[in-house]
Amino acid sequence: MSAGHCDRLLDIAYLNFGLSTFWTIFGGYWLLNTWWWHQRNSSALHKALFAMLVLRALCDLFTGLLFTTCPFTGGSVMYLTLAVNTSFTLSCTLQYTCLLLIAKGFGVSRHTLERREISELVTALVVTYLGFSAYNLQPTVLGPMALGLLCGLFCLTLFYTVKTLRKIELQIASYRQHDIPQLIVPTALKWQVVHKFYYLAMPFFLVKIAHMSASEVIVKWFNEAMFDWYLWGDLVGGVLEAVLLGAILALIRARELSPYSSLDYSHDLVFSPMVKGLLGSKASKRIPPKTPVVVVIGPLTGLYGGVEIGFPEQ
């Protein structure tokens, strides 16, 4: 490479150093928020996202250091290239897997997954890892494959997000039907979080797809005039990606919510038959001491009238 190219790559290196600093600061905040300030509200998803932030910071740091070695003749080039490829592959795998988890509502509207969903996520994780690993080995040949993989992850994320929104809407409708207003508000908050995630994930993936597509065009038809376009494209793409991903992380961070926010939604939501049945004038139930009890009391007249509920003194 010419000296002019190396000077421009040095500018890209400064951009990567800046992004690495941003992810390091964000990761420090995430560490305190997850393990200190809101430890009771954190989940496995928040811990996985912290690992992703560490990998993103390392990837940008190693990339910046690699560009400073231009024209890439030093002995450290091989080790820096290996570090960049490894951190890039792991960070992409963890990043897109976490986005799929959020799209399924894990860590936001529920804290469990079905066996079928776990199998789907493991398959997506393996395919993502293998795809980006191959892309690092032959980026000029396998670029279209990586671009297709990214488009597939984009479609899966939007599909799962819409599906999760629909399930939460059905849950809210069921609460309204059975007149349980205490659970409507926290469930509606979950819907808002997933809904905002939908409108943040969409531009995030579009920016990634546009950035990778532009890089593919420049790599295949490279000339002197296109080098400046590569520089500006990397600058704009990197900044937009950092802003959108940071907004997604800020949206789903661990925080204090409603006391009912930890309740998972059920796919087959069935309420007690006693809610629909006619109760007698008295109903008794022996309850062990210090056992938590949830009681929903209807009107004292009408269909459910004459209900008397007693509690043990202990």
Predicted regions, residues:
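Generic detector of multi-pass transmembrane helix bundles and their immediately adjacent loops
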Residues: 76-302, 306, 311
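Hydrophobic alpha-helical transmembrane segments corresponding to the first two to three helices
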Residues: 2-115
